Curated annotation (Swiss-Prot):
GO terms for cellular component: cytoplasm; peroxisomal matrix. It is an enzyme of class 1 (oxidoreductase). Belongs to the DAMOX/DASOX family. It comes from the Eukaryota. A motif (Microbody targeting signal) lies at residues 332-334. One of its GO terms (molecular function) is D-aspartate oxidase activity. It comes from Caenorhabditis elegans. This is D-aspartate oxidase 1. Expressed in the intestinal cells, hypodermis and in unidentified cells in the head in adult hermaphrodites. InterPro entries: D-amino_acid_oxidase_CS, DAO, FAD-dep_OxRdtase. The lineage of its organism: Eukaryota, Metazoa, Ecdysozoa, Nematoda, Chromadorea. Selectively catalyzes the oxidative deamination of acidic amino acids. May play a role in the egg-laying events and early development of the worm, in addition to quality control of the germ cells. Its cofactor is FAD.
Length: 334
């Protein structure tokens, strides 16, 4: 009997999971369901620089980094959206940078603290401390479509549809349902009210001469993309509005230009806002269910709550979610 697997969410988490499930269970019928076009998801706009916020997620990040290294070796970057970038993170708090070192200093390449002379040479308005490293960046508007293409090549079907209740999918014959619904993940789960939005805004500007990422304390930054440079951002918890205001633009540009005056009066090519699906911890959990309507037994695998680290952690957490999917199928002998 062919197992039917539904994955809710077409962002980086849903597509990473769908590809791994299709590879791990090649005889399954895998369907990805999304209630909006990819361009309207939180995964479309990010430049995707590798950086781990929470040391507890180190292993997920390491798994993702290894996957990016594989893509870098074997595929063209203009197709995958994955490329190597070097750059700097500045802070007046050495402790914050030491936390970064513990979280991923031995995962990325060339991680080190800059000497005072280097900081003064490089930055017109320098912070007290600065780290340098080389890592992968994954452009959302290329990387996720690449994952989707790989899924479709393995027979995964993509449908635009709003799922209001997980049980409705069980009643349609799905044996395993993977909840990668991001900000809606807790609502769909029905037992989790801990997911909340962190509003983000970035500007795409023309600055072909700018080749390195540059951060000041994780909110003010630039990340080069293939044809533009991203300037960001804001991190506003529990704000649901997506409209980009003049206040947003002025705030972001003034903060970054104070850090790097050469970027003053940039030509803005585009802008994007999104709601990061935040949670205290990422939820990766298998729950056995039974439909009240039909009596059908089914399994839900929850996989959501990545906040702003979806691109850094998503492949690694999808490895764990896929293990739970396989475990569910083995238990039911499908």
């Amino acid at each position: 009997m062919t197992p039917k697997i539904a994955i809710i969410g077409e962002g980086v988490i849903g597509c990473s999971t769908a590809l791994q499930v299709a590879q791990a269970v090649p005889d399954a019928r895998v369907t990805v369901l999304s209630d909006r076009p990819f361009e309207q998801t939180c995964s479309f706009g990010p430049a995707g620089l590798f950086r781990i916020d929470d040391i507890a997620n180190r292993e997920f990040g390491k798994s993702t980094f290894d996957w990016f290294a594989h893509l870098h070796r074997t595929e063209k970057g203009d197709k995958t959206g994955v490329k190597l970038l070097s750059g700097h993170i500045q802070s007046d708090s050495k402790e914050r940078l030491e936390q970064q070192q513990k979280a991923y200093g031995d995962i990325v390449y060339n991680f080190r603290f800059l000497e005072k002379r280097e900081i003064l040479d490089l930055f017109p308005n320098p912070s007290e401390h600065c780290i340098h490293y080389t890592a992968f960046a994954s452009e959302g508007n290329k990387y996720v479509p690449y994952l989707k293409f790989q899924c479709q090549a393995r027979g995964v079907e993509f449908l635009h549809r709003k799922v209001r209740d997980l049980e409705e999918l069980a009643n349609e014959g799905y044996d395993v349902i993977v909840n990668c619904a991001g900000l809606s993940g807790g609502t769909l789960a029905g037992d989790d009210d801990s997911v909340y939005p962190i509003r983000g805004v970035v500007l795409d500007v023309e600055a072909h001469w700018h080749k390195h990422f540059n951060y000041k304390d994780f909110i003010t930054f630039t990340i080069p993309k293939e044809n533009s440079v991203v300037i960001g951002s804001v991190k506003q918890e529990n704000r649901w509005d997506l409209e980009i205001t003049d206040v947003d633009r002025k705030d972001i540009l003034e903060r970054y230009v104070a850090l790097h005056p050469a970027m003053r009066e940039p030509k803005i090519l585009g802008e994007w806002s999104g709601l990061r699906p935040a949670r205290k911890t990422i939820r990766i959990e298998k729950v056995e269910k039974k439909s009240e309507k039909s009596g059908k037994k089914y399994t839900v695998v929850h996989h959501y709550g990545h906040g702003g680290n979806g691109f850094t952690l998503g492949w690694g957490t999808a490895v764990e979610a896929t293990k739970l999917v396989k475990s569910a199928l083995n238990s039911s002998k499908l």
